[in-house]
């Protein structure tokens, strides 16, 4: 426990007094942190997160994330427990209240695991290098056939994931297009493999997308191939509007379980937050900011002969 004494500073005056105090106290507090050499830091407010240089993120928008800096490898971003007693709406339109107690407790438990060594979070660059080897991108119709044959011949107990990348969020728009269709499945060795099939691009000369879609549709229309997705109702509607295909064999939507677990917590249902909350050990937290690098890594894993095909 440490306290920073600042003489002549009235914390009740001026704009953003908390930030002003922290800015003045930062050198002292950072020196105390270096001296204590903690295994993990739990940051409860955005002011602390930013003024002490832990990260540039907002605690509200980035709750649950694990950041690092030059002197501490693990900084858990969470919310101050006081929000559980504040039944009011914050500036972002989100309701504070007792519903937040569970997610704050989850973040503290995550910090405890980090301190004990029970949780180790790889660097994002290392994680991307590792997982990029399990991502395959179709570059010809023959590869599309290979991908769909793999999916068709999985054991009957298998479940595949399905996701679309689209030109927008409105499937009824005249400009709505499906950019890629992506599938995931677990191999016999236990790895998760991702199969990506591009369907539209301004410079796409690899193959005719309509032919590729004919093979994809066979997978989507097969009720015996069990499918899951995150907010899969969007993919179902978009597919129906753009192609007329009504997806069969859907068994689960992972967003629904997040709605149950994080009931009442706005903006806590996306994949970005789910990665930090439930699979931080993969090191893929923050992946959405590194997608261009991931694409480059995947491309580098392909041989020149494969690309030329």
Model-derived segments and their meaning:
Residues 77, 160-162, 250:
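Residue-level marker for buried hydrophobic side chains located in beta-strands
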């Amino acid at each position: 426990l440490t306290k920073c004494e600042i003489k002549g500073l009235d914390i009740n005056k001026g704009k953003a007094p908390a930030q002003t105090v922290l800015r003045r106290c930062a050198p002292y507090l950072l020196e105390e942190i270096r001296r204590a050499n903690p295994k993990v830091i739990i940051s409860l407010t955005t002011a602390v997160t930013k003024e002490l240089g832990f990260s540039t993120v907002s605690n509200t928008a980035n709750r649950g994330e694990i950041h690092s800096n030059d002197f501490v490898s693990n900084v858990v971003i969470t919310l101050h427990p006081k929000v559980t007693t504040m039944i009011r709406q914050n500036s972002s339109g989100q309701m504070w209240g007792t519903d937040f107690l569970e997610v704050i407790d989850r973040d503290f438990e995550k910090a405890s695991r980090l301190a004990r060594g029970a949780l180790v979070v790889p660097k994002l660059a290392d994680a991307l290098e590792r997982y990029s080897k399990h991502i395959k991108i179709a570059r010809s119709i023959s590869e599309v056939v290979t991908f769909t044959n793999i999916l068709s011949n999985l054991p009957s107990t298998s479940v595949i994931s399905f996701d679309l990348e689209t030109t927008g969020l409105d499937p009824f728009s005249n400009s709505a297009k499906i950019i890629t269709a992506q599938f995931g499945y677990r191999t016999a060795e236990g790895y998760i493999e991702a199969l990506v099939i591009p369907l539209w691009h301004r410079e796409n000369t690899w193959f005719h997308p309509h032919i590729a879609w004919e093979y994809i549709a066979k997978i989507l229309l097969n009720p015996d191939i069990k499918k899951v997705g995150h907010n899969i109702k969007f993919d179902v509607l978009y597919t129906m509007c753009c192609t007329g295909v009504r997806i069969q064999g859907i068994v689960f939507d992972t967003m629904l379980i997040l709605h149950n677990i994080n009931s009442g917590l706005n903006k806590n249902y996306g994949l970005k937050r789910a990665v930090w909350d439930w699979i931080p050990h993969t090191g893929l937290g923050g992946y959405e900011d590194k997608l261009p690098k991931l694409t480059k890594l995947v491309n580098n894993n392909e041989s020149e002969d494969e690309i030329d095909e």
